[in-house]
Design a protein with these regions (language model features):
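S-adenosyl-L-methionine
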Residues: 1-47
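Surface-exposed loop/turn positions
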Residues: 12, 76-77
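Short amphipathic alpha-helical segments
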Residues: 28, 51-53, 92-94
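Glycine/threonine-rich flexible loop motifs
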Residues: 47-58
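A short glycine-rich, Lys/Arg-flanked "PGG" loop and its adjoining helix->strand segment in the class I
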Residues: 57-75
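Short catalytic-loop micro-motif centered on adjacent basic/acidic residues
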Residues: 78-82
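Class I S-adenosyl-L-methionine
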Residues: 83-127
Length: 127
C-alpha cells in the first residue's frame, strides 16, 4: 500500500500503519478501542488490469477495515467502505449487515458506469 498525505482538521488524529498488520494488541497499545464514531475506508488496491485479482485485493482491504472498525467503533457507530464489486461482494455485504443495525449499498453518480467501485455503509454498530 502507498501511504498518502492529506490535510486534515486540527482535531483529527492520524496513524500510519499497514492495515493488513493491525490487530487488537496494536490498537490496545495506542488506546484506540471503542473510541470512534465513524470508520471510513476509501482504500483501493493498485489495479493490475486483472479485474478478478483487483476485486480480491479490494475485498482483503475491506475485510481488514471492517475488522479494525469492530475494534475501534463505539456502539452505534458507522462504517463506510469502498469495494470493487464481484462475487465476494455479497459475503462482505453480509459481514456488514451482521454487525450493524442498518446498511446501505450505493454507487456514487461520479463513478464511471463500467466501474466496479461501490460503497457500503453500516450504521448503528451493534458492538
Amino acid at each position: 500500500l502507498k501511504a498518502i498525505r492529506i490535510k486534515l482538521p486540527p482535531q483529527t488524529e492520524t496513524l500510519t500503519a499497514d492495515i493488513l498488520t493491525i490487530d487488537r494488541a496494536w490498537l490496545d497499545e495506542r488506546e484506540l478501542g471503542n473510541r470512534f464514531n465513524v470508520v471510513l475506508s476509501d482504500m483501493a488496491p493498485a489495479t493490475s488490469g486483472n479485474k478478478g485479482l483487483d476485486a480480491a485485493r479490494s475485498f482483503q482491504l475491506c475485510q481488514a477495515a471492517l475488522s479494525i472498525a469492530e475494534m475501534v467503533l463505539k456502539p452505534g457507530g458507522s462504517f463506510i467502505c469502498k469495494i470493487f464489486q464481484d462475487e465476494e461482494f455479497n459475503e462482505f455485504a453480509d459481514n456488514v449487515r451482521n454487525r450493524f443495525k442498518h446498511h446501505k449499498i450505493f454507487k456514487p453518480r461520479s463513478s464511471r458506469k463500467q466501474s466496479k467501485e461501490i460503497f457500503i455503509v453500516g450504521m448503528g454498530f451493534k458492538g
